[in-house]
Amino acid sequence: MANGDKVLGQFTQSFEEEKKASGRRLKVGIIGTGWIAEAHIESYKQMDDVDIVAAADLIPGKAEAFMKRYGVEGVHFYPSHKEMIDNEQLDAVSICTYNTQHAVPTIYALEHGVNVLLEKPFTVTLDEAVEVCRAEKKSGKILSIGFQPRVDVNMQMIKKIVESGELGKIYYIQTGGGRRRGIPNSTFIEKSTGGIGALGDIGCYSLDMVLNAIGYPKPLTVSGYKSDFFGTNPATQHPDRFHTVEENARRFSVDDFAAAFVRLEGDIILDFRIAWAMNINTPGDTIILGTKAGLRIPSTDCWNGTVGGEMTLYHDVAGVPTEEKIPILKNPDDKGLFYHKVRSFLDAVLNDLPAPVPTSQILYNQAIIDGICRSAECGHELAIEIPEI
């Protein structure tokens, strides 16, 4: 990112320059060539130190058509991630498969000395996430999870405000988001491919926004709820290129709404809710309450990776309760959040830096999602137990 400063009172947002490459070119492969891979390809194509040399997809001809559509030549194509990794000398891979197939290719890549940029959600279950983390630790390679909101300057401002101490001790957080109608198609809505629904697709973003801001405290207990009232109803479903509304309603086997009450280490309460569909425009703004001040962050429909509008800081000035508006900050260039997500991963590979979005943090995110699912199924609060890595 280009250098620059945005100032709000005592808070200054700084943008660091991208790390300069030393002339080394990275050989990159793509695993899974569905729609999310499009954002990866568009990002890689803007970089002059990357060669896209291989692509793997289970569907015959899909990877070839994908690369042709994006004008990428000289690519070797494979029917599986194993064949691609075994036959190519890759520096890194983007894993863009459907959710239930995140863990297996990630582990295989790490075990074979390849750095990994893995699309969110991390995995479907906590057990899978733990297995991936152990493979990462053993490999010594970089594994970064694809949370592009991390590079948004407004998200960074939230963290900066919390870390400044302006809010005091954080004791309560409300977060979430969603859409009145916004159920996705294809592999998202079936348990065999999506694994989890709105909870994993967009809920992981809402969790990361606040957990990253407060330093990712360990989750202790969770009481969760999830439902599928809209996804299984033809009246609130929608067709796609391959299925009618009735067919999509029959196929739907994940959650379209989830809510939870989570206790975090440090005596912090997290009140969470997320939806692909609901009969209201928002489940509520994100609220971070501290002993000195509070911060309100307008909710979004979880499409664009930033905040929903001007934030408000509630604090006392000379003993007088005061509301201070925090204007939306403009990101420093027009390359987009996805580009900077990919670039930060490659910079880590080139310069031997830590993963931009480390699994040590997202493991806690996944533990909460896993706990919500398990609690919803059994109908009562559960302890969250995270195995040693």
Regions found by a protein language model. Give the residues of each.
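Contiguous beta-strand/loop segments that form the cofactor/metal-binding neighborhood of enzyme cores
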Residues: 2-22, 208-306, 339-353, 370-371, ...
